[in-house]
């Protein structure tokens, strides 16, 4: 049995949710209604996020990148946590509902590209189009966009020990099939609503300390 860690990006690896930051800075007011429909599950994540990015003109590409480079902060302890999982031969994947044009640059030099799974974007038209290369498999009908539970099934064996780290509604389906969940913010609410056991965290020092205990138990 091997330990596999599947970690969200926006609001988990970064302190802020980069998609929401982009919308607040660059999207028109109607983005707020779409965001609320995603959080209430009135819109699927795939449909809602597609609608949000269709509100953003593609000629803002460079401005958005510059804005995120200046404002996005990596959560405390993340660099040390990555070193810890490497030293302990723990598989680590970023599974992000975020977009390639900001996830890759913000993780450059920290996580190899082949360990990052995120959505793709097309800037060839007037507004941003999202592409979904990691959509739901036959076991999921939730129109997740990037389907985290499907990726877990694809990347691991059923007898592996699955750890999910996340913060929001987009991590719920993955949390349902995890052996251990580290949760913060809105994911805590969703875990409690769905009776999913979780360990709360605010920094990756919290996660590392708990994972160290887990390794000692399993040794």
From Swiss-Prot:
Top-level EC class: hydrolase
Q: Name one Pfam family in it.
A: HAD
Reaction(s) catalysed by this chain, per the record, are: 2-hydroxy-5-methylsulfanyl-3-oxopent-1-enyl phosphate + H2O = 1,2-dihydroxy-5-(methylsulfanyl)pent-1-en-3-one + phosphate
GO MF terms here are:
2-hydroxy-3-keto-5-methylthiopentenyl-1-phosphate phosphatase activity
Keyword terms, alphabetized: Amino-acid biosynthesis, Hydrolase, Methionine biosynthesis
Asked if the Swiss-Prot or TrEMBL record annotates the protein with the keyword Amino-acid biosynthesis, the reply is yes
In which pathway is this protein known to take part? Amino-acid biosynthesis; L-methionine biosynthesis via salvage pathway; L-methionine from S-methyl-5-thio-alpha-D-ribose 1-phosphate: step 4/6
- Asked whether the UniProt record includes Cell cycle among its keywords, one would answer no
Q: Which InterPro entries match?
A: HAD-like_hydrolase_phosphatase, HAD-like_sf, HAD-SF_hydro_IB_MtnX, HAD_hydro_PyrdxlP_Pase-like, HAD_sf
* Entry EC no(s): 3.1.3.87
What superkingdom heads the lineage? Bacteria
Q: Name one GO biological process term.
A: L-methionine salvage from methylthioadenosine
TM segment ranges: none
Physiological role: Dephosphorylates 2-hydroxy-3-keto-5-methylthiopentenyl-1-phosphate (HK-MTPenyl-1-P) yielding 1,2-dihydroxy-3-keto-5-methylthiopentene (DHK-MTPene).
> Which family does the record assign?
Belongs to the HAD-like hydrolase superfamily. MtnX family.
Q: What is this protein called?
A: 2-hydroxy-3-keto-5-methylthiopentenyl-1-phosphate phosphatase
Instruction: Record the organism.
Output: Bacillus cereus (strain B4264)
